[in-house]
Curated annotation (Swiss-Prot):
The active site is at residue 98. The gene is PAL. The modification 2,3-didehydroalanine (Ser) is found at residue 193. It catalyses: L-phenylalanine = (E)-cinnamate + NH4(+). This is Phenylalanine ammonia-lyase. GO terms for cellular component: cytoplasm. Its main location: cytoplasm. This is a key enzyme of plant metabolism catalyzing the first reaction in the biosynthesis from L-phenylalanine of a wide variety of natural products based on the phenylpropane skeleton. Homotetramer. It is found in: Cytoplasm. NCBIfam families: phe_am_lyase. GO terms for molecular function: phenylalanine ammonia-lyase activity. Pfam families: Lyase_aromatic.
């Protein structure tokens, strides 16, 4: 601001460094943020004005959904035209301008007055990518990433600091709205002066280069002329006559920003999913819910941890599994671990920092997709071309590296939980490998899935290695530091994909565990009924109808059934090698030893009742166990599935009913991979989002009060 004498006066500014704005953007819960992202993703139109684009909107346009349209703000037209006119006026006056009358980068000392020819050469020499033969060796960027990049580039150019013509932005918008996607090379950018090599192919398409290709709405291959005609751009191709047609299209990192936006949309959803999966893990493992108590996390102060714990606390609050587990913990408490293992007990502390990192990265990318990243920047108000470095993609490379590390940490936790879940030494009574068949010798359940999980986890941990520390000096040492943003974003996209493989496999395993707890409860009930019936028939009265001392054994016999893991004997409940029969006999023997002088009398001896009890039980128990199993399989169980009384039920219901999965056994043809594939596809399509959020619909965004 200048006074009447022409001196610049410093104007008082609020939040001049934007720290307050950055902090304000993190207000509220992460879950609310994800809900807003999902709502934005589902809007039918994206209106671009240069400053309000979101990660979710970019992800939506990337999906090639015909139901969503891109609209340009007419209010931006004047600013874009003003900067374009300024460039033309500057050139007509003979002003020396970078990229208009000069060469590029390290060769900017060269000069020319042939602005159109210079732009044409810029696009030609940057067309240096390799595509491969598209069969065994395809090096084409995913079309979703290209669409995302086009959207981001339009948005940043709309702010009117780049010198480009508005009709170019309209042409790119029409390509998007007609589902016509330029073919870009997968590799070849260091995200220094933007993603120059890949983006040159977009410029090549709209200017009619013969090597330019696009993919049409039905997957057909189009040349430049066909692409522009189908997009109804109103012309065949754009002739390269403007001195600022090529450079503004290229000088920015929209490619990496588009991919980063897609990646972070999914990463945020996966972060919430990991919280809910950890809570379900606590349910099926009969975990102690006190690990979510708010005081513990309040004393640590980290918002991500506090929210993760509060979400898990909400799922576990009132859970039928937690209520049942409380009774188990009260039984023989001195013979059981006092606390759960780290993968369960410290899951909020583990997930909290990852959520904070992913959320911070999301905000950083949203600032970037609404930034002006060109060089030079055209300041029409001051009649200046400012030569700077906003094209440097360091915020993107760093945020992608950080996000990838967070994703790897989430995957590590899921693998640790999965490993406990399938191991009968740790899983509190579930069968080894989560086998559900009648014969464990012919059913190995999730053994293959565990091997696959180890593979996924190893790859994910490798992908966590940073990219940004591998910078090489480029372009004759002009681009001697560069962000490697797109490489990092590509690796983060791979990490998201691998984490989805892990999450889908883990969710199928959790549903298997839920059904096994359901089966376990019904089998135990059948065993208790059988023991009760046999005890009453064989232990209540003596040979002459008199009451027998053995009648007092029934309570201890039922206590044995409660204490023994059902799946430790369910395949052959009367086997002498399994613990049930051994401990039932021991309970009778203990009573006999306390029977004193009565044992000398055949009419009152408990020892003499043991054989009759065991023989009768062997005749009854296998039939009762099989009948209970059949009742569960046919949908007529004596005891309903507890999951229906839990807040985690919507996710289970979606996997079982929505996707048509089932309890896996060695007796059936269906394999674990088939079920995991269904869940993975649902994750990729986004259909898992609604049941996930349904689990948390009643959460008020705060922990339970400390009482």
């Amino acid at each position: 601001m200048a006074n009447q004498n022409g001196f610049c006066i410093k104007k008082q500014q609020v939040d001049p460094l934007n720290w307050e704005m950055a902090a304000e953007s993190l207000r509220g819960s992460h879950l609310d943020e994800v809900k807003r992202m999902v709502a934005e993703f589902r809007k039918p139109a994206v209106k671009l004005g240069g400053e309000t684009l979101t990660v979710a909107q970019v992800a939506r346009i990337a999906s090639r959904d015909n139901a969503v349209a891109v609209e340009l703000s007419e209010e931006a037209r004047a600013g874009v035209k003003a900067s374009s006119d300024w460039v033309m006026d500057s050139m007509n006056k003979g002003t020396d301008s970078y990229g208009v009358t000069t060469g590029f980068g390290a060769t900017s000392h060269r000069r020319t007055k042939q602005g159109g020819a210079l732009q044409k050469e810029l696009i030609r020499f940057l067309n240096a990518g390799i595509f491969g033969n598209a069969t065994e060796s395809c090096h084409t960027l995913p079309h979703s990433a290209t669409r995302a990049a086009m959207l981001v580039r339009i948005n940043t150019l709309l702010q009117g600091y780049s010198g480009i013509r508005f009709e170019i932005l309209e042409a790119i918008t029409k390509l998007l709205n007609h589902n016509i996607t330029p073919c870009l090379p997968l590799r070849g950018t260091i995200t220094a002066s933007g993603d120059l090599v890949p983006l040159s192919y977009i410029a090549g398409l709209i200017t009619g280069r013969p090597n330019s290709k696009a993919v049409g709405p039905n997957g057909e291959t189009l040349n430049a002329e066909e692409a522009l005609r189908l997009s109804r751009s109103g012309r065949r191709i754009f002739r390269v006559a403007s001195p600022r047609k090529g450079l503004p299209s290229l000088m920015a990192p929209p490619l990496v920003l588009g991919m980063a936006s897609m990646v972070l949309f999914e990463a945020n959803v996966l972060a919430v999913l990991s919280e809910v999966l950890s809570a379900i893990f606590a349910e099926v493992m009969n975990g102690k819910p006190e690990f979510t108590d708010h005081l513990t996390h309040k004393l640590k102060h980290h918002p991500g941890q506090i929210e993760a714990a509060a979400i898990m606390e909400h799922i576990l609050d009132g859970s039928s599994y937690v209520k049942a587990a409380q009774k188990l913990h009260e039984m023989d408490p001195l013979q059981k671990p006092k606390q759960d293992r780290y993968a369960l007990r410290t899951s909020p502390q583990w997930l909290g920092p990852q959520i904070e990192v992913i959320r911070a990265a999301t905000k950083m990318i949203e600032r970037e997709i609404n930034s002006v990243n060109d060089n030079p920047l055209i300041d029409v108000a001051r009649s200046k071309a400012l030569h700077g470095g906003n094209f440097q993609g360091t915020p993107i490379g760093v945020s992608m590296d950080n996000s990838r590390l967070a994703l790897a940490s989430i995957g590590k936790l899921l693998f640790a939980q999965f490993s406990e879940l399938v191991n009968d030494y740790y899983n509190n009574g579930l069968p080894s490998n989560l086998t559900a068949g009648r014969n464990p010798s012919l059913d190995y359940g999730f053994k293959g899935a565990e091997i696959a999980m180890a593979s996924y986890c190893s790859e994910l941990q490798f992908l966590a290695n940073p990219v940004t520390n591998h910078v090489q000096s480029a372009e004759q040492h002009n681009q001697d530091v560069n962000s490697l943003g797109l490489i990092s974003a590509r690796k983060t996209a791979e990490a998201v994909d691998v984490l989805k493989l892990m999450s889908s496999t883990y969710l199928v395993a959790l549903c298997q565990a839920i059904d096994l707890r359901f089966l376990e409860e019904n089998l135990r009930n059948a065993v208790k009924n059988a023991v009760t019936q046999v005890a009453k028939r064989t232990l209540t009265v003596g040979a002459n109808g008199e009451l027998h001392p053995a009648r007092f054994c029934e309570k201890d016999l039922l206590r044995v059934v409660d204490r023994e893991y059902v799946f430790a004997y369910a395949d052959d409940p009367c086997s002498a090698n399994y613990p049930l029969m051994q401990k039932l006999r021991q309970a009778l023997v203990d009573h006999a030893l306390q029977n004193g002088e009565n044992e000398k009398n055949t009419g009152t001896s408990i020892f003499l009742k043991v054989a009759a009890f065991e023989d009768e039980l062997k005749a009854v128990l296998p039939k009762e166990v099989e009948a209970a199993r059949i009742a569960v399989e046919s949908g007529n169980p004596a005891i309903p599935n507890r999951i229906k009384e839990c807040r985690s039920y919507p996710l289970y219901k979606f996997v079982r009913e929505g996707l048509g999965t089932e309890l896996l056994t060695g007796e059936k043809v269906r394999s674990p991979g088939e079920e995991c594939d269904k869940v993975f596809t649902a994750m990729c399509e986004g259909s898992i989002i609604d049941p996930l959020l349904e689990c948390l619909k009643s959460w008020d965004g705060a922990p339970l009060p400390i009482c």
